[in-house]
Design a protein with these regions (language model features):
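Bacterial N-terminal signal peptides that target proteins for export
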Residues: 1-12
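C-terminal motif of bacterial Sec signal peptides marking the signal peptidase cleavage site
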Residues: 18-20
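A common structural junction motif
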Residues: 130-131, 282-287, 385-393
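Short amphipathic alpha-helices in soluble, non-transmembrane regions
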Residues: 269, 380-388
């Protein structure tokens, strides 16, 4: 069997599957301060759009701002995003940009700011989240909330996910304002709470309670992309992956019922046995392979840089590959390829009796289903009930679910991303990504806003291991490149 390496997809999974995976125990608010005093970094004055000589200073300014931002401990839970929102509001106010802070729950805040254009084209939303996942200081070589700048890196929890990208978006706002760039579109800066937990008080709250803030927007930029830097390539970029869609979660509760009793007297309809049989059928079920447009495009593009000739052939024509048994075995043996080609099912929890000698009347399991774009949750539910084939076992969705949608590549924004990427790195590939996880972009795609995941910072595989991991850090060079990338994309689409 051909070994499918799939290293770039594994990296993408590390970067983007982290969404919604925070550990549950609430940590203490360690770190220098939950509300640090704003320090004024060296500020680059502009009378027009930046020229080459300006970018070193703008990168230094971004580094100083990110260092400060990382000192605000927004570990979720509890989040304490109000402190981050107040800090961002002060940075914006200092530049003459007013911001509104919404606090849908105590300590949980969302910040909204807008640069006005002439209204001849629809707005662009720059979306980022302020919360971060738990950092265990005993496993770090630096204080995760000190915002330390050392050895050419800015260190701290959130540097990659996603305070670094938030600073790139913030700097885009500041540069546009400072340089008095005439705009045809409003630029909306939206920093939200709660992305790592999903308790409904962040992007979901904006979409449901304040939709008029963003309803008119044509485009949204968020996390969920990847810029792959060549290892040892001195800043050379191998490819840009732009997130155009993502799988949707469809979490299910499976419940089996039977006759309770004493463990010493087995019953014929023990619900635990019934549940095990049902779950065995589910685990053995091979869901159909489905090729979505985003995956077909990305596989075809990435085939051009795939070194393994067999895998290259599969990726270059994935529709033919999924009809070939050898290709199917090879592709589905790789966890990431498998996740991108089918609806997936993971059994993640079981519960029966809390006593060894008691047969319970009910046994339950939880299943994490991820559906491809275009798949109907109700139809999938009916199919999994058919597979189980036991009327004493019920399957119910845990909560709200949705069908994932895909943002078109035939837009001014996608063309701008491609043009800027190719101007900065002419040899780099630009392609689409579908995330096996999900981001807050789905709230806005469902509002009809074309939403794209950017990974503006050129990262090697080693760099990306810090996402939700120990010693998370972002290089100063990558930060500078990301600020420039964001500004050039946004100004290309929004400037007159």
């Amino acid at each position: 069997m051909v070994e499918v390496r799939g290293g770039w997809w594994r990296l993408a999974a590390i970067v983007v599957l982290a969404a919604g995976c925070a550990r549950r125990p609430a940590p203490p608010l360690a770190g220098p301060s939950s509300a640090p005093v704003l320090e004024t970094p060296a500020r680059v004055s502009l009378i027009a759009a930046p020229v080459e000589s300006d970018w070193k200073g703008l990168g230094d300014e971004a580094t100083a701002l990110l260092s400060q931002y990382l000192r605000i401990n927004t570990t979720n839970p509890p989040g304490n995003e109000i402190a981050a929102a107040r800090w961002l509001a002060e940075v914006l106010r200092r530049e003459g940009i007013e911001a509104r802070i919404f606090e849908p729950a105590p300590g949980k805040a969302n910040l909204y700011a807008r640069l006005a254009g002439d209204g001849s084209a629809r707005p662009i939303v720059l979306l980022n989240h302020m919360d971060v996942v738990l950092a265990s200081p005993e496993f770090w070589t630096v204080d995760p909330f000190a915002g330390l700048v050392k050895d050419g890196y800015v260190w701290g929890r959130g540097a990659l996910d996603m305070k670094g990208e938030g600073i790139a978006q913030l700097m885009t706002m500041l540069i546009l304002k400072r340089a008095n760039v005439p705009l045809k579109r409003d630029i909306i800066f939206l920093a939200t709470a709660d992305e790592e937990i999903g308790a409904g008080v962040g992007a979901a709250w904006i979409a449901e309670q304040q939709p008029d803030l963003v309803r008119a927007a044509e485009f949204l930029l968020n996390e969920g992309g990847l810029t792959r830097a060549k290892t040892g390539g001195q800043g050379a970029v191998e490819f840009y992956g732009v997130g155009t869609t993502e799988k949707s979660p469809f979490w299910l509760d499976v419940t089996a019922r039977g006759t309770a009793g004493h463990g010493s007297r087995p019953t014929a309809d023990n619900p635990v046995h019934r549940l095990i049989r049902a779950l065995n059928r589910v685990s053995e079920w091979k869901t159909p392979l489905i090729v979505t447009p985003a995956v077909e495009r990305s596989f075809r593009d990435l085939a051009t840089i795939e070194r393994d000739t067999t895998v290259r052939r599969w990726l270059s024509d994935i529709r033919a590959a999924v009809r070939d048994s050898a290709a199917v075995r090879g592709l589905t043996s790789d966890l990431t390829y498998n996740a991108l080609l089918r609806n997936t099912i993971s059994i993640t929890g079981l519960k029966g009796s809390n006593k060894t000698n008691v047969i319970p009347p009910v046994a339950t399991a939880v299943i994490d289903v991820r559906l491809l774009p275009g798949q109907d949750p109700a139809a999938f539910l009916a199919e999994i009930v058919r597979v189980i084939g036991d009327t004493a076992v019920t399957v119910k969705p845990q909560g709200p679910n949705w069908s994932a949608t895909e943002s078109s590549t035939e837009t001014e924004m996608f063309r701008a991303i491609t043009a800027v990427a190719r101007r900065q790195h002419p040899q780099a590939l630009v392609t689409t990504l579908m995330l096996a996880g999900f981001t807050d972009s789905h709230y806005f795609r469902r509002m009809g806003i074309a939403s794209y995941g950017l990974g503006p910072f050129p990262l090697t595989q080693a760099d990306s291991r810090g996402v939700h991991g120990n010693d998370e850090r972002l290089s100063v060079d990558a930060l500078r490149a990301g600020v420039r990338f964001y500004f050039e994309v946004v100004s290309r689409v929004a400037a007159k």
